[in-house]
Regions:
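Glycine- and acidic-residue-biased ligand/ion/polar-headgroup-sensing regions
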Residues: 52-71
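Short beta-strand His + acidic residue motifs that chelate non-heme Fe in jelly-roll/DSBH
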Residues: 23, 47, 66-67, 90, ...
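Short acidic-glycine-tyrosine-enriched beta hairpin
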Residues: 70-92
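Conserved short histidine dyad/triad with adjacent acidic residue
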Residues: 35-53
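A short, N-terminal "cap"/entry segment at the start of jelly-roll beta-barrel domains
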Residues: 1-33
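Short beta-strand segments in beta-sandwich/barrel cores
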Residues: 35, 44-45, 62-68, 87
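His/acidic/aromatic-lined binding-pocket segments of jelly-roll/cupin-type domains
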Residues: 48, 54-59, 80, 88, ...
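Double-stranded beta-helix
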Residues: 5, 11, 72-74, 97-131
Length: 131
C-alpha cells in the first residue's frame, strides 16, 4: 500500500546543485499519466473526485486556489493556496476544485491513464465546492 503525503502541500526533497545548474526531484513512483495544463484567469477546474486515481500537481507559474474535502462531507471545503514551485497531492475519494485568479501552468502526474474513456470511468462530478 502506498503511503500518501500527510498534507496537501508536499515537501520537496533537496535539489542536486552544481556548476551546471540544478535538478529538483518532484515525484518518484509508478504512474500512468503526465499532463501539462494551462488555465486562464477566472477558470475553475475539477469539482469532482476520483474513485481510484490520485494525482500530484506542480505549479510552474501562477497560483492555484485549491479546495478539498473527503467525498460525502458536507462541511465547507478546506482552502489551500498553491504557489509557483509548489507540489501538491490529491488522493482518491477527495472532492476537489481548482480556482485560477491568474494565468497558471502546472504539470499533473496521475495513477491512471488520462485516455478520455479511462479518465471518465473513474471521475465523479460533484456540485461546485468552491465558494
Amino acid at each position: 500500500k502506498l503511503l500518501w503525503p500527510k498534507a496537501v502541500i508536499v515537501d520537496l526533497p533537496n535539489s542536486f546543485d552544481d556548476e551546471r545548474g540544478s535538478i529538483q526531484p518532484l515525484v518518484d513512483m509508478k504512474m500512468k499519466s503526465s499532463v501539462l495544463i494551462t488555465s486562464n484567469e477566472g477558470a475553475v477546474r475539477a469539482n469532482h473526485y476520483h474513485k481510484t486515481d490520485w494525482h500530484y500537481c506542480y505549479v510552474l507559474y501562477g497560483e492555484i486556489i485549491y479546495y478539498h474535502r473527503p467525498h460525502g462531507n458536507k462541511e465547507e471545503p478546506k482552502k489551500v493556496i498553491v504557489k509557483e514551485g509548489e507540489l501538491f497531492f490529491t488522493p482518491p475519494m477527495i472532492e476537489h476544485a481548482m480556482v485560477f485568479e491568474k494565468k497558471t501552468k502546472f504539470i499533473t502526474w496521475g495513477r491512471n491513464s488520462r485516455v478520455q474513456e479511462v479518465y471518465e470511468s473513474d471521475v465523479y462530478r460533484v456540485p461546485a465546492i468552491n465558494p
